[in-house]
Curated annotation (Swiss-Prot):
Residues 288-356 are annotated as: Disordered. The gene is FAM199X. Belongs to the FAM199 family. The keyword Aminoacyl-tRNA synthetase does not apply. Pfam families: FAM199X. The modification Phosphoserine is found at residues 316, 321. This is Protein FAM199X. The keyword Zinc does not apply. Residues 288-312 have a biased composition (Low complexity). Residues 330-349 have a biased composition (Basic residues). It comes from the Eukaryota.
Amino acid sequence: MSDEASAITSYEKFLTPEEPFPLLGPPRGVGTCPSEEPGCLDISDFGCQLSSCHRTDPLHRFHTNRWNLTSCGTSVASSEGSEELFSSVSVGDQDDCYSLLDDQDFTSFDLFPEGSVCSDVSSSISTYWDWSDSEFEWQLPGSDIASGSDVLSDVIPSIPSSPCLLPKKKNKHRNLDELPWSAMTNDEQVEYIEYLSRKVSTEMGLREQLDIIKIIDPSAQISPTDSEFIIELNCLTDEKLKQVRNYIKEHSPRQRPAREAWKRSNFSCASTSGVSGASASASSSSASMVSSASSSGSSVGNSASNSSANMSRAHSDSNLSASAAERIRDSKKRSKQRKLQQKAFRKRQLKEQRQARKERLSGLFLNEEVLSLKVTEEDHEADVDVLM
């Protein structure tokens, strides 16, 4: 009897406001409903069972913009006709949207048969979307939608993915000798200044260091007691750095040995002129002695007089060569002492610069004040009368 009553049920408007929980059922044969519970709907066209269908409360909707999720327009054939299945996410107040999800119980719907395009798309959507935190509303519009829509563009939402963590490219070490001052970063400027100061202080003399200081800061005041010069970063420019590089190239250690060899050759020519003259006179005297000895057979008296004269000349020349050799030894000794003094001074200067750099980097001596005191002793010639 109940089957006949369900079969005689007339067409009812789908989810009308007057009947919030109508009995849904299109005209079909008797016994098609698998269960006798009220509100149960067997829709073979959609392949799903609805636990309850009710009108969505407009106050329950979120009035914020959410991601648009639209499935492809899939034509579902039925015995009575064909209706287009359309699903979307509500983005405002839409009175035509009806919720197929119960507020208390979540029912899993099998709207798409396994193996179809929409089944694959729905599985891909489930991986992109958290269904438990979203409020989806399904629509059944009356107008037909073209079934030739783009599946991927309609179904898959444009969900912002997390940015890929690309490995940071390591900055290649640039050749600072070829970069202008303005193209360097702060770290590169500090590194290059330390490199220049170390190169100049270790490979160049005092005169070259003073010239470079004048190039960097022409108004710098340097006293004879100063042992260091601090280079400020704002003093250097591209033009000054270019001049410093050219000066270092001109006075580099590769060029210095040639100049020193040239100076040494001139000095040796000037200092050993007496030695060469002495050696030449000695050789001439020895030759004259040999010639006089060879000619002794012809004239004995002449050879005796010549040999005595040549011996006296050779003795004076030997004294001259000894004094010249002594002068050379003295000059070599003085040059060696001068080199040792320069080496010790350079070593002490490097040590002071290293200590000053450590103090500057530590920051412990920023507020240091150096006071110079001068004590003058007065000569007390007269006795001081204490009793007065």
